[in-house]
């Protein structure tokens, strides 16, 4: 597994991976919300530590951190369920990752992080933009 810091030229690949992954894992997300979020992702990427993750020279996903908090981890659906997310999370934990937030409706993500040692420490009724998607705060 190899990681490289993302640059603006990588944003189209990042948006593509985000779109495919969210369509695969976030069936609770309304189409309008999906489109709104997709439009603002570049603004978030500009202020986060964004890494592209590669396997055998192929981009398989990306992560975005704010200090020790994981803001985003998305893998291309083709690479999900094959241990790559676990490898990436372990690397980030070794580098200081401490917290993550997940959508309550995304049971797969919740169970993924729980199995890797994260525990729920809080809950918000709405996401950071005030949408009706409860957020679970998790910490090691």
Range-by-range predicted roles:
Residues 79, 83-92:
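Conserved acetyl-CoA pyrophosphate-binding loop and the N-cap/start of the following alpha-helix
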Residues 69-80, 102-103:
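A short, internal acetyl-CoA/4′-phosphopantetheine-binding micro-motif in the GNAT/acyltransferase core
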Residues 94-106:
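Conserved GNAT acetyl-CoA-binding A-motif
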Residues 103-107, 116, 122-140:
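C-terminal "cap" of GNAT-fold acetyltransferases
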Residues 2-16:
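A short beta-loop-alpha structural element at the N-terminal edge
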Residues 40-52:
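A short helix-loop-beta-strand connector motif used in the catalytic cores of GNAT acetyltransferases and
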Residues 49-61:
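Conserved beta-hairpin
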Residues 16-42:
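Conserved GNAT-fold acetyl-CoA-binding loop/helix
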């Amino acid at each position: 597994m190899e990681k490289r810091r993302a640059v603006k030229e990588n944003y189209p690949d990042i948006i593509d991976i985000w779109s495919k992954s969210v369509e695969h894992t976030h069936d609770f997300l309304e189409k309008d919300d999906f489109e709104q979020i997709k439009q603002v992702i570049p603004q978030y990427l500009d202020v986060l530590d964004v890494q592209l993750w590669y396997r055998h020279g192929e981009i398989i996903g990306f992560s975005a951190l704010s200090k020790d908090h994981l803001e985003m981890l998305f893998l291309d659906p083709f690479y999900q369920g094959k241990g790559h997310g676990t490898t990436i999370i372990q690397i980030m934990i070794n580098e200081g990752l401490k917290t993550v937030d997940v959508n309550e409706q995304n049971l797969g993500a919740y169970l993924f992080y729980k199995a890797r040692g994260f525990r729920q420490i809080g809950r918000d009724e709405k996401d950071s933009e005030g949408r009706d998607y409860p957020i679970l705060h998790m910490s090691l």
